[in-house]
Amino acid sequence: MSKTIVRKNESIDDALRRFKRAVSKTGTLQEVRKREFYEKPSVRRKKKSEAARKRKY
């Protein structure tokens, strides 16, 4: 879990920007979106192989 403490004389916008950067760096939002709905293992394998095929070509 990302945590950001607002520094002295720091605007909320700057603190929010630091928080967003920390969240994107850890991949938290992507993980939440990925796990929003249950995905059957067969579908997960199919997506994984399609992604590998897409990377190859």
Swiss-Prot record:
One of its GO terms (biological process) is translation. Keywords: Ribonucleoprotein, Ribosomal protein. It comes from the Bacteria. InterPro entries: Ribosomal_bS21, Ribosomal_bS21_CS, Ribosomal_bS21_sf. GO terms for molecular function: structural constituent of ribosome. The keyword Translocase does not apply. GO terms for cellular component: ribonucleoprotein complex; ribosome. PANTHER family: MITOCHONDRIAL 28S RIBOSOMAL PROTEIN S21, SMALL RIBOSOMAL SUBUNIT PROTEIN BS21. Belongs to the bacterial ribosomal protein bS21 family. This is Small ribosomal subunit protein bS21. It comes from Geobacillus sp. (strain WCH70). The gene is rpsU.
